Structures are given as structure tokens and as C-alpha cells.
């Protein structure tokens, strides 16, 4: 079945930023679109979708644990069967980590959700993207090579590596954290930073391979940095949240990527409030005598 109604999907959407993005997109599309609000807990997903539906928004609850490859593929197949394709996908699901829990006890869930979950979503939903469609991964401004020591940059050589290579890189990183070797290898102290770099790398790798077709079809594939958002996941890590945005405020720029005109220069890049955050700093000019 092919639908002429716009179809959107947001993961990790039963709360926080994801819920605000789903609501904002449904509000922007109105009767012209339907948004799948997904998460891994059926009760929370159903409650969130029901609340938005009571507000007059066209949302559909969907249970999808991005840590489960079969669940992701199954949801993609159901949407393909019902609608023939998708117009907007936000891979937003993220694992909440705590300062009070050893990194070795958290890193597997973090990587499986944030990174392997993102590449599962990209592989499953990228091929379903319709002409003019957009696929974004929610990341952060930590997700650039500037956050990583130079000797580790080659681990994220997005110009040449595949998504499979990247999956192995982040698995190797998780292994290093669990074994206690990560610090000695020079990885950042906060495990969220390599995870965010991996998310942006996934976008860059997939976008590289799809560039010609995506440009022809007017599609956008990018990572988005919403900035500091006051959510359950962020509060334990920041003592001053006075400048944090509410989820609804932060969702505005994400929804713009779904509904506004496509800026070709944003393709494959990390975008924050309409501005591209460079993956790597330009090489310094070589001076000659």
C-alpha cells in the first residue's frame, strides 16, 4: 500500500525531547500526516500517544526497542506494508546513564542503544525514505572529532569506513571500558562523548553512500544537536540547568529539519539551530618561507 499522507517516526518518543518532536511534527503536519511515536515500554508509549491524541494530534503508538534488530526491522516492514515509505525519521532513542554507576556497568546499554540502535534504524529506514524525505539522528555538539584526542581520529575515518566498521569500532570501545583499558588508550573520561561521536559518524558514513541518489531525490540525512535540554537523562550531569531548553523549545529546530526547506550544505553534517558544526577542524595552512 502506498500512502499520500506524510509518515513520520520518532524513537525514544514516550518522554522528553522525543515526545516533543513527535508532538511538534504532528502539529505541523496536521491532517496531512501521521507520526509514529515509538519507545520500548508499551504502557508508556500508549500513554504518551493517547495524551497527544487527546490534544488533537495524529499520532500512532509503536513499540520498538532499538536494541533489538528484529524489532527495528519488523517495525520498518509494517510501515512499508502500510504506507509504502516514510517521510521523516528521527533516531532519538538514548540510554540514560548515571554518574553514580560505574561506566563498565553502563557502557554496553549505552552503545547498544545510542550507536548500534542508530545504525539499525539507518539500515532499516534509510531505504524507505521517500523523495523529499529526511532522516536525522539526535546527537550533540560533543559528537565531533574536536572532542577526541588526535591519535583516535582514525577510528572514525568516515570517508572510507562502512557502518559495519563503525559498529565494530564502538563495540571495541565498549570492550575497552569494561576491561579498564579505555583511559590508557586516551578515550575521553565521559562515556557519552565517544557515543555521540559514533552517532554523527554513522550519519556521515550512510550519507556518503547515498549522496548521489539523495541529492536527486531531494532528501536530507543529517545529525542534529538540540543543545542542552532539561530532561531526566541530562539533569544528573549538569549542576546548572538555568540555560537549558525545555523539550518543546528544543524540538522546534528538529521539526524545522522535517518541515522546512532542505539546505544541501546540511547533508551528512551535524546541525545545530541551522548552523553546521564541523566534523573536524580544517587543516592549518602550511607556511613557506
Put a short name on every predicted segment.
Residues 120, 223-226, 231, 236-289:
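C-terminal helical subdomain
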Residues 57-58, 78-91, 97-103:
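A glycine-rich helix->loop->beta "capping" turn
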Residues 67-83:
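Conserved Rossmann-fold cofactor-binding substructure of NAD(P)-dependent oxidoreductases
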Residues 110-111:
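A hydrophobic alpha-helix adjacent to the NAD(P)-binding/active-site core of NAD(P)-dependent oxidoreductases
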Residues 11, 85-97, 114, 132-140, ...:
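Rossmann-fold scaffold of SDR-type NAD(P)-dependent oxidoreductases
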Residues 2-36:
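Canonical Rossmann dinucleotide-binding motif of NAD(H)/NADP(H)-dependent dehydrogenases/reductases
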Residues 52-70:
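Rossmann-fold cofactor-recognition segment
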Residues 95, 99-103, 134-216:
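Catalytic loop of short-chain dehydrogenase/reductase
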